[in-house]
């Protein structure tokens, strides 16, 4: 199965789709896309009911974990696409992020 993937340049700003962040709690707290749903990859199978409806952009730090999530979720019938380059490319492109603490957001 081919994993649906998009590069940061192909992601509209503002985002017209939901975002699922599959990074760990400490990574999420340091910086994430505002409005994203956070479900760590290891918890995904047990939390499918919390997923956003409709097309969803799936992100992690560099694109590996999100590719695994997209592969799994697509098999479950979800309309998902992986962000190649992940949050590192998101931040490098100057896209907005927020942190859980109110401090300057960064990619951990």
Task: Locate each region found by the language model.
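Rhodanese-like catalytic fold shared by cysteine-dependent sulfurtransferases
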Residues: 1-18, 22-56, 64-108
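Short cysteine clusters
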Residues: 60
């Amino acid at each position: 199965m081919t994993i649906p993937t998009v590069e940061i340049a192909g992601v509209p700003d503002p985002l017209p789709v939901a975002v699922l962040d599959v990074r760990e709690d400490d990574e999420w707290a340091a910086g994430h896309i505002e409005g994203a749903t956070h479900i760590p990859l290891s918890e995904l199978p047990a939390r499918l009911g919390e997923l956003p409806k409709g097309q969803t952009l799936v992100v992690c730090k560099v694109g590996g974990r999100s590719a695994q999530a997209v592969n799994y979720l697509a098999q479950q019938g979800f309309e998902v696409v992986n962000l190649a380059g992940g949050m590192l490319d998101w931040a490098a492109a100057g896209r907005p992020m927020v942190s859980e603490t109110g401090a300057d957001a960064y990619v951990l």
